Amino acid sequence: PTALPDIEISSIARVSTTFGEIDRVLGGGIVPGALMLLGGDPGIGKSTLLLQVSQKVADTVGTVLYASGEESQLQLKLRAERLHINSERLQVIADTDLDHILEQADAMTPSLLVIDSIQTMYTGDIDAAPGSVSQVRECTSRLLRFCKERNIPTVIIGHVTKEGNIAGPRMLEHMVDVVLYFEGERSYQFRILRSIKNRFGSTSETGIFAMVEEGLQELSNPSASLLAERSDEESGSAVIIYLEGVRPILVEVQSLVVTTAFGMPRRTAIGYDLNRLIVLLAVLEKRCGFTLGNKDVYVNVIGGLKVNEPACDLSMAVAIVSNLKNRIVPTDMVILGEVGL
């Protein structure tokens, strides 16, 4: 054992990914010897994100080993060309045998090891199929031991279930040092990197990206992108300040109110809680005297974001009344406030 005061801080200096948004979420960069888990829906951009991070680390720090059990080397090359990635220090291996991958990593001593994905890996010591609980547990345990002994930071990609949880044993999240979720709607360009667990930093920071043709582009000022196409000549639009972690973001909310053609009016919410919308409409009708019982009401949060803060109630109510009365909300106005009964 080593006395705590004798441990040099320089020995745990962080490695920057040169992605400001990712470094923000990680607490300043990658900690050597850390085991990190990245989860997210299929097709959301997890592999794209880690390929771009691998390129940056390879260019600025040293060799990176990217091990894929889901794509061949040719498929990885095609993806890399689309992302304009062509670094000689980025080494790729297409294999599902974790023992062989760790042998290669031990010989190379890379500055970063990426496993894509943990559900495709297996070890011959366990008599079970890849992706099973026992295989995922054992493979993660070996990766944890390897990265701690060699002081090599390692990122593993994990699939998620229909409920949004990372597939595999629950203890998987307890074994790793950092758990990140990559979220967003596939039909929208915005992506959010969220920290669920971080032994080396805060879990209240988020990173925001846009999926473009060349890959993921970090957004240091997401408010400008979210409000870029807002019209100042249309009613039913308002701006809120939405807290994503500890990060305030300006977001546009929209509303459309039309006379219903059926007996029961429709209430539809995209990115906003439907129950809160129903409460808002009841308050507007009872307390403010607006007739909404014969109106279909549709509300939407721009960018595919989901807002669930009570402080967004008032801006949504203003957007609804704005469209109902065809009155335009000033573009330089931000509306905040919780609406009670």
Question: Language-model segments: which ranges?
Answer:
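Flexible beta-alpha connector loops of hexameric P-loop NTPases
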Residues: 11-13, 39, 65, 87-95, ...
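Phosphate-binding/switch region of NTP-binding enzymes
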Residues: 144-231
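P-loop NTPase nucleotide-binding/switch module
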Residues: 1-29, 121-129, 217-220, 227-233
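Residue-level signature of catalytic and energy-coupling elements of molecular machines
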Residues: 25, 76, 116, 158, ...
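Conserved P-loop NTPase/AAA+ ATPase motor core
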Residues: 205-340
